[in-house]
Amino acid sequence: MPCPGLQENVTIYKLSIDICRSSRSSSPMNLLATSPSASTAFFQRSAGRWHSQRRYYTLNSDQEPLEAISAIEVVFLPAEHPHLKPLAIAHHLSPDQAFQCGAKVTWESTYTNVQRKPLKGETIFGIRDQLMYRDRGFSTTAPIVAEFELIQPHVMRLQTAYDGASFEEEIKFVGDKHRTRQTITSRAGQELMIAQYLETRL
């Protein structure tokens, strides 16, 4: 059954995608994108426990958006942390000083508007230059690499591609207690899904 107002929402989200991409292509690379200290500060700021509320919108479909809540914990990992060594090996990098820092993220998610089994998981990632190395992707257990940039001290953008799909993500802090996230999933140049998150620090 169609969700009231869904088509209007999809149109608005598509416009926001176009505006975001236009702004990104027309503006010069922000100097923050090459600053290791700024990247480390962003990861340190992310550390802690978060309550996440999110929606998944399937584009070009009358399907109602999926809704979920998650309990998330982010642990900051300094460069010498032992958790980063297996990640370096998985990506065929030298384990010694492979990353400037990283993080371990654990989560437990529950869908609120459909009957599905709760999901639990964890992932480890590290950053080096303008690349983010992860032990798994959004929809794969294989190690993946994302490109990232900081367009402001509180805003990070990432691009990831694997298995014929691409993922554009933006993470933005709103003050000290909240952050927003948006992920756009595309295949063959066609946007398929938008995931939007509001996360509150506990």
UniProtKB/Swiss-Prot annotation:
Disruption phenotype: No visible phenotype; a triple cpcS/cpcU/cpcV deletion mutant has decreased amounts of allophycocyanin beta subunit (ApcB) compared to a double cpcS/cpcU deletion mutant. The lyase activity is therefore unsure. The keyword Translocase does not apply. Pfam families: CpeS. The keyword Zinc does not apply. Keywords: Lyase. It comes from the Bacteria. GO terms for molecular function: lyase activity. Gene3D superfamilies: 2.40.128.20. InterPro entries: Calycin, CpcS/CpeS. Belongs to the CpcS/CpeS biliprotein lyase family. Covalently attaches a chromophore to Cys residue(s) of phycobiliproteins. HAMAP family: Chrphore_lyase_CpxS. This is Putative chromophore lyase CpcV. The gene is cpcV.
